[in-house]
Each structure stands twice: as structure tokens, then as C-alpha cells.
Amino acid sequence: MKFNIVSPVALSCLFFLFLTGTLAQNAGSIVTRELFEQMLSFRNNDACPAKGFYTYDAFIAAANSFPGFGTAGDDTARKKEIAAFFGQTSHETNGGSAGTFTGGYCFVKQIEQSDRYYGRGPIQLTHQSNYERAGQGIGVGQELVNNPDLVATDPIISFKTAIWFWMTEQDNKPSCHNVIIGQWTPSPKDTAANRVPGYGVITNIINGQFECGMGPNTAAESRIGFYRRYCGMLNVPTGENLDCNNQKNFAQG
């Protein structure tokens, strides 16, 4: 019988990767089925239009298409990313009572549907340009432009569009992913606009034109409330700079 001997250097590298979390398998190593159900228990309430749509298996299948999602950095960084992602998307799809932060993932479609490319899915993907870029990003080409309702009828595609948005830089905006794992360095223009690392700038990325630079507001507080709840469930600190109350939105340069 032949034995393969692993060198001390290789063992040291593996140990380092283990300590830093680089070998984390996928988002499922943090978000177990049980935790998913606890975080999003309201989603299958009879009052929710999304009842039965957002499943754990669909989330994991989508997450596994993005190897960096929920796997970058140490244990705290990975958990904070999961808390931040679900904090933002729970607000976007909230159907619960104000101030409870338990009603996430109740909706799939935007209630007020002004055009064909209205908000759908966990991130409430809007605008034809985003449907086109998301389709390219998740490997379905023009399918989302031709049939945008796929984001509201195929749960894996729905989650994929949300994670694609989360992982992707757009225009002058960093990716939400890079912000939450501490890999974003503000430019001089960002600094002048009070855009600083933290959960608040993620709100700015997603909906800054309507929620940032105008002082405290209900929507921004909802996003923070969900994030705090999930950080508590994952036993990680929220970090600083949770709001974007004094930040210029990215559209202002």
C-alpha cells in the first residue's frame, strides 16, 4: 500500500487556511436549514403572497453559484455578510408589523407595478438595465429581459439575481460584498460625501436616492433593525456606521 506524505509546509498552509476561514465550504456552513427557518419563519404565513416560494434549497443552490458569497474572511466576517444580506433583503420583502423585524421574505413582487421591469425577488430587482445585467451575470443571457417574471417564478433564479446584485460593482458603487467584508476603501469623493465603510453604505448602494442624506427615516431604520436581529442570531457585532443619514447618495457623485 502506498502512502502519500503531506509536507510540514503544506500542513501549515492548510492550518492557516482553516484558521482564516478560506476553506469554508459555502454559505450553508453558516446558514443551516434550521437557522434559515428561524430567520425567515414568517415567509410561509398564509397572509404572505410569497408563501412556499423562498426555500432553503433554492437559497443554497443560488449561493453555491457565487463561491465568494458568505465564504470570505474569518468566521465573523462571513456571518456579518449573511446578516447584512438577509437584513437588506428582508426589508425589501417585508410583510410583517412595523418594528418587529420578523416579516422578511413575505413578498416576491413589488406591490405598485409601474412598468414591466418592476421589483421582483429578494433584492426587488428593478429597471430593464438591471434585468439585462443580472441575466448576463447569472448565465441566462437575455432571458430575464424577455421574461422578467422568471425572477418571481423560479426561486433559484430569484435568489441568484439578489446575490448577483450583492456581489457586483455597478457604476461608481462598490459591491455590497466588498463593503461588508471590509475590502472597500472609500475614494476621496466618497469621503467628501460621508460615505464610510459600514452597513449604512450598503443601504446607499441599494436605495440611496430615496433613503440617504435626509436624516433618520423609517425605511433605513427597518434595514438596520433586520440586520441587528440577524447579527444577534449569529452572535456577531454589527460594526459601526449603520445608517446613511448624512451620506450623499451615489447618484450625486
Curated annotation (Swiss-Prot):
Indicate whether Hydrolase appears among the record's keywords. Answer: yes
Induction or repression: By fungal infection.
Quick one: signal sequence residues? 1-24
* Keyword Transcription found: no
GO cellular component terms listed in the entry, alphabetical order: extracellular region
Catalyzed reactions per annotation: Random endo-hydrolysis of N-acetyl-beta-D-glucosaminide (1->4)-beta-linkages in chitin and chitodextrins
Q: What is its main location?
A: secreted
What would be an example GO MF term here?
chitinase activity
- InterPro entries for this protein: Glyco_hydro_19, Glyco_hydro_19_cat, Lysozyme-like_dom_sf
Q: What does this protein do?
A: Defense against chitin-containing fungal pathogens.
Q: What family is this?
A: Belongs to the glycosyl hydrolase 19 family. Chitinase class II subfamily.
Name it. Answer: Acidic 26 kDa endochitinase
Q: Which organism is it from?
A: Solanum lycopersicum (Tomato)
